[in-house]
Amino acid sequence: MKHTLVRRAAAIRTATALGLAASVLAVPGSGLAGAATGDTNPGDIVLGTITLAQAAATTPFPGITRTVYQDTDRTWTVNVMDIDPNRAPITFDGSIGQGMYTTQTVQEMLEQTTGVTSRRPYLGVNGGYFDDGVVLDQTDRIYLGDLGGTSMKNGRLLSEAGGGRYAYDPVTGKAVGLRPANSVLMLQNGRPYITELGTALTVRLSDDATVSRKVDGVNRLPGRAGHCLRNTDPANTDVTVAGGVCFDPSEIVEFTPEFGARTPAADLLKQTATTTDDDPGVEVLFNAAGVATACFRPGATAGGIVSDAPRGGHDVPPGGRALEGTGDGAAWLWDNACTGRPVSLHTVVTDTRFGDTVADTWFGRAPAGAVELPIDPAMYATPVGDVLLRDASVVYQVPGDTARAWRTAGGADAFGHLFFVTVEGQKGGTAPLAAGATRSELAQLLKALNLVDAVNMDGGGSTTLNLRDQNGSEPPVTTTTDSAPRHVADTVYAAVGGYGLAK
């Protein structure tokens, strides 16, 4: 079947990406960025002036190898988790914890995956970038769990595309434009791969497809799109972009049951400088059959499904959806969905790297000529940052890359193994490497480990690697730049399951 977003074996992705690269014949983890000479040993990794010596190598679980490297001054600690689904029954997946409305520690999310301690994930790391500008609890640093790009789980789109990251001129290193979609780490049918996904969502009248409107987001605050990095929509001249966040006073945002809480009310941010979320707007609730069961608008004459009330504070119906509108988005919902006329919600997800497209009309009829291909429920996608390796080549080459931080990376090698790599600096240290690694150094490290495709994931205080202990708990084995493990939006993990193939 052509469409990987539907059910194509992800192993084919890895084989396609190889391009018969020389690394196919390499032993995983044996590649070196520099020759082992002088005071270096055969197992060392040399990154320019940095030499990483192997400090420990263990097999904590069947099919999973953990290798720890440290530099000469023990300023860096590098954890390399090599996960081979051919060697043991291992499954790859991700978790959003209690819901898209909040953040939790990686340990909390891993331990909540099942009540059976022996079936909890073997290991997990922090997942995608998220909007840390919406703080729900300042004391415990709990944020709204708005992932910064395309996220999918259980066959549903949980977060819209971030609009792409900046593309850089290889000579000047300057940003020259935006890529059409954001990078994602995909885990599907026991294989990892990395691609770019764009999304397009539309709500329309089922009996008149000419009456339609763009749905701007999924499971986030109307008026604020974190990590959007997109060009201002010419149709919305009142959109402003600041610090990679788009502020739009006219939106429609979809909420799925995975939001996990009541829909957000107007002015949730309580920020005088931010007014794009102030509109009390309109909210419409739809049941699992796609029938509008309630419409809320302040000042409206109550009757039928209409109530005189602002948006927010409502549970998403089981199996259903909620649509919140502000500005002209509120006007569209009031004029159409609140009248009782049937509407359709159409979602398109496009893989801009491999050319696949899925289209799913959640309720109502599909647009004329649309090909309905549901999202594969076996797939988990989390939004990530810069692509570091593609087809066994370092593609992140930005002159003047000096920003250091704790790092988390995910990737795949030529054999379809999933790799998680963390780089910790030295908290409070004064050595040059104490602040962590640059993206360029991380890319060279992943190249030395013989990865084929790899990406930079959320890092800094978010960097976390957790391993299941003998009691079934999931404590972190990494340090943190924060005072305690950070609350993050999702985690990706390796767990019990799958089908080992090796004899």
For each predicted feature, which ranges?
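Secretory targeting and sorting signals
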Residues: M1-A35
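Zymogen propeptides
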Residues: G34-L333
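Active-site-proximal beta-strand/loop segments in catalytic clefts of secreted hydrolases
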Residues: M81-D84, G124-Y129, D413, T422-G425, ...
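General beta-strand structural signal in soluble alpha/beta enzymes
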Residues: L123-G127, M186-L187, I194-E196, S344-T347, ...
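Short, Lys/Arg- and Gly-enriched loop/turn segments at beta-strand edges
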Residues: V135, V348-A366
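A short "linker-to-beta-strand initiation" element
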Residues: Y193-N231, V358-V387, D391-S393, Q397
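Loop/turn positions that initiate beta-strands
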Residues: A337-L345
